[in-house]
A protein has these predicted regions:
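Long, well-ordered mid-to-C-terminal structural blocks that present hydrophobic/aromatic surfaces
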Residues: 233-322, 327-329
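Short glycine-rich or small-residue beta-strand-to-loop segments that form or flank ligand, phosphate
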Residues: 51, 193-194, 308-315, 339-342
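Single conserved hydrophobic/aromatic residue that forms the stacking wall/gate
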Residues: 1-13
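General beta-strand structural signal in soluble alpha/beta enzymes
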Residues: 277-278, 340-341, 439
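Internal alpha/beta domain cores that form substrate/cofactor-binding pockets in large enzymes
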Residues: 285-295, 301, 305, 319-349, ...
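An N-terminal, globular interaction/scaffold subdomain
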Residues: 11-160
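Conserved, well-structured core segments that form the ligand-binding/active-site neighborhood
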Residues: 96-267, 352-448
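General structural feature for long, well-ordered alpha-helical segments within catalytic domains
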Residues: 19, 27, 77-80, 84, ...
Length: 448
């Protein structure tokens, strides 16, 4: 699949029509009324253009960060050409009419520059412009499926109008071509990535396989699919096959942009020692009986693939760790080495376990090992992808992997990183944590 970034945008303004001229994107004035009218549950909407000099602006909780991309011609996700706008992202924020944040187990409201972990796969990069829409949904629907769904669907009105403009641009606007290839490597160790996504209902849901990258049209909610495993290609993942609705704790939330830049998928694709055959998305139901029903489907699906090893990842922590552990068990009991990746540390410590959970990678970056409500802080990054691949290779080779300590010890991570660096002869760049950000009032009062 080709990604063709249109000229990096320097400015975004509101004007009479939505269009792109040179390095400037114009968004139609009055489009807010159409966003509100699109969904009965949307009661108010405000559109802001946030430039880098305005990062110290108050915002309600960030529900999602999305790339702006569209398919060329009749191309479908994972194939053909995709046009991408660089230098700008869509950002959805919101509350209900009572002022309650659309989030659960924490929220990221506050000054943007104090509550975003810049550069995380799912977060904005410093220097980008935010097309930020703040939606107000009907009171008390913030914790129902229909509230967040209405917010995301209405906000996509603006993104889709931009996509339609992008389709009409001539090739002079293309400044860079990036080719993404999914190369199979017969004879190498075949591996699969299982990504557990939220599916408990209420706000915990995702749209899968829309027509447009991170779009709405044509997508199916994984809750409506029964949360059963859905197999996709690595390129479908990187082309925006997941529109994330989940509003779990901000620090471990995988936003739509996270899948667009999914680090483990990218690391496995580029690793010449493994053969990445695909990615399996599986929802996390609310009821335990449904969790085990779905988990058995995961085990059979992975067994049918005849893989040599597997990864199981999850966002969030707590309830979803029940099926996270069960996925690992169902794969492991079939004689397949499996590495689990999750935020654990102190606050996300696993509530369940089994004998197959011997190969684990912790996504924690926070200083205290907690959900600190800083967007993206504890999400899977390249460094976890590198560690997980090294661990799975060791497991597939039958090498010893030491048992985890009973209590969280951040030195385990640094020791493993040093071992991998010594073996591979290259430096692993570790990302910053919340200590690199200006101190927010919330962090000062609650965490630090």
């Amino acid at each position: 699949r080709d990604r063709s970034p249109s000229r990096g945008l320097g400015d975004v303004y509101k004007r009479q029509e939505t269009k792109i001229e040179g390095t400037t994107l114009y968004i139609r004035e009055g489009i807010e009324a159409e966003v509100i009218a699109n969904q009965e549950l949307v009661k108010d909407f405000h559109l802001e253009i946030i430039t880098p000099d305005q990062y110290h602006t108050y915002s309600e909780t960030i529900m999602d960060v999305q790339p702006i991309a569209t398919k060329e011609g009749d191309a479908i996700l994972g194939e053909g050409a995709t046009r991408v706008l660089d230098g700008v992202v869509m950002m959805l924020t919101g509350t209900d009419e009572g002022g309650v944040q659309i989030g659960e187990f924490g929220s990221s409201e506050g000054y943007l520059d104090e509550n975003i972990m810049w550069g995380r796969p799912g977060c904005p990069d410093k220097g980008e412009i935010f097309i930020k829409g703040n939606i107000v949904v009907q009171e008390k629907t913030n914790m129902e499926r229909r509230g967040p769904m209405a917010a995301h669907t209405a906000f996509d009105i603006i993104t889709q109008e931009i996509r339609e403009v992008m389709k009409e641009l001539d090739d002079s606007f293309i400044v860079e071509d990036e080719e993404l290839k999914s190369i199979r490597r017969p004879g190498k160790k075949k591996v699969v990535i299982v990504k557990e996504i939220m599916g408990q209902g209420a706000m915990h849901d995702n749209f899968i396989l829309p027509v447009e990258p991170v779009g709405i049209l044509g997508a199916r909610a994984n809750v409506d699919l029964g949360n059963v495993p859905v197999c996709v290609s690595p390129l479908e993942v990187l082309d925006g096959c997941i529109h994330a609705l989940t509003c779990i704790g901000p620090a471990s939330k995988e936003m739509s942009r996270h899948y667009w830049r999914e680090p483990l998928v990218l690391e496995a694709l580029h690793d010449e020692e493994v053969d990445l055959c695909g990615v399996v998305f599986v929802g996390s139901p609310q009821i335990n009986a449904e969790k085990y029903y779905v988990s058995r489907r995961v085990g059979h699906t992975v067994e049918m693939m005849d893989v040599d090893g597997a990864f199981v990842t999850t966002e969030g922590f707590g309830n979803n760790h029940i099926d996270f552990a069960s996925h690992i068990e169902q794969i492991g009991m079939r004689g397949i080495p499996v590495v689990g990746l999750s935020f654990c540390a102190v606050q996300g410590a696993l509530v369940v376990g089994n004998k197959y959970m011997q190969y684990m990678v912790d996504n924690n970056k926070s200083e205290s090992g907690i959900e600190n409500e800083v967007l993206g802080c504890n999400t899977l990054c390249q460094e976890e992808g590198i560690r997980a691949l090294a661990m799975l290779k060791a497991a597939m080779a039958g090498e010893e992997v030491k048992a985890a300590e009973k209590k969280w010890n951040p030195n385990v991570k640094s020791t493993n990183v040093e071992l991998i660096e010594a073996a591979c002869g290259k430096k692993i760049e570790l990302v910053d944590n919340e200590q690199s950000l200006p101190m927010s009032q919330k962090r000062k009062e609650k965490y630090d």
